[in-house]
């Protein structure tokens, strides 16, 4: 049976996400920015939290873990990098590990760059990836702890996922990401269509996530830094993908 997924807002612009296995009743939160919105989402559905799958140690992704752990006695899964302080962890995971949420199987991808400990969770049967702050809709995370080559390698891992996979990310940044991307590729038809869609969704008060990996591969300039069209957009014809990516990220940091 297909998993049920619920998306909701936490803090100011964070997304909270629940993935639920109807066969067993198991429910996992992908990160826990704060506890109350997670509790409210669970109560609306009549679900009980069994797991928290942490992507990285930033406070806006783990701020609700302690309270949720106390309330539900749920299992807390976190990246294996112990240099990042994350409290209440029951299980540490790394590249290729499989996490069971009831009958649902989540595969761990190490996607460092934004932070050194960052992981993404891929549920292949459900055709969904939870990429948190590595890959955003039409964007990517800032490189705080890693290097540009490290982040580019992480994006390539995510780009290898099938086009049909849905992407859930950690923040509602799509509008600003599109405005930046249009400065690089003002004539990209997929990007322009996405811009119109995002304007409509935001006007209706609806989230711009999830998006499809196939769409990201056509419109996300960070994910396409090795595309000659993107290189031309930053006047770096012939440069490597990682060189173009670094230039894009530097420009976005200043925008």
UniProtKB/Swiss-Prot annotation:
InterPro entries: Clx_II_MBL (IPR035680), Glyoxalase_II_hydrolase (IPR050110), HAGH_C (IPR032282), Hydroxyacylglutathione_Hdrlase (IPR017782), Metallo-B-lactamas (IPR001279), RibonucZ/Hydroxyglut_hydro (IPR036866). One of its GO terms (molecular function) is metal ion binding. GO terms for biological process: methylglyoxal catabolic process to D-lactate via S-lactoyl-glutathione. Keywords: Hydrolase, Metal-binding, Zinc. Pathway: Secondary metabolite metabolism; methylglyoxal degradation; (R)-lactate from methylglyoxal: step 2/2. Thiolesterase that catalyzes the hydrolysis of S-D-lactoyl-glutathione to form glutathione and D-lactic acid. This is Hydroxyacylglutathione hydrolase. It comes from Nitrobacter winogradskyi (strain ATCC 25391 / DSM 10237 / CIP 104748 / NCIMB 11846 / Nb-255).
């Amino acid at each position: 049976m297909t998993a049920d997924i619920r998306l909701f807002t936490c803090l100011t612009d964070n997304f909270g996400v629940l993935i639920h296995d109807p066969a067993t009743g198991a429910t996992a939160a992908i990160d826990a920015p704060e506890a109350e919105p997670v509790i409210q989402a669970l109560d609306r559905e009549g679900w009980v939290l069994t797991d928290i799958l942490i992507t990285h140690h930033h406070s806006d992704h783990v701020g609700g873990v302690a309270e949720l752990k106390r309330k539900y006695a749920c299992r807390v899964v976190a990246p294996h990098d112990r240099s990042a302080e994350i409290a209440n962890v029951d299980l540490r995971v790394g590249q290729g590990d499989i996490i069971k949420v009831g009958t649902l199987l989540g595969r761990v991808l190490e996607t460092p760059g934004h932070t050194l400990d960052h992981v993404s969770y891929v549920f292949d049967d459900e055709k969904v990836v939870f990429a948190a702050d590595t890959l955003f809709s039409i964007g990517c995370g800032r490189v705080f702890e890693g290097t540009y080559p490290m982040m580019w390698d992480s994006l390539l891992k995510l780009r290898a996922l099938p086009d049909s996979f849905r992407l859930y990310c950690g923040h509602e940044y799509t509008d600003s990401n599109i405005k930046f991307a249009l400065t690089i590729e003002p004539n990209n038809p997929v990007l322009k269509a996405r811009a119109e869609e995002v304007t409509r969704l935001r006007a209706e008060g609806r989230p711009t996530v999830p998006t499809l990996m196939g769409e990201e591969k056509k419109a996300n300039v960070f994910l396409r830094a090795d595309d000659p069209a993107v290189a031309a957009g930053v006047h770096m014809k012939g440069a490597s993908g990682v060189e173009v990516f670094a230039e894009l990220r530097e420009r976005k940091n200043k925008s």
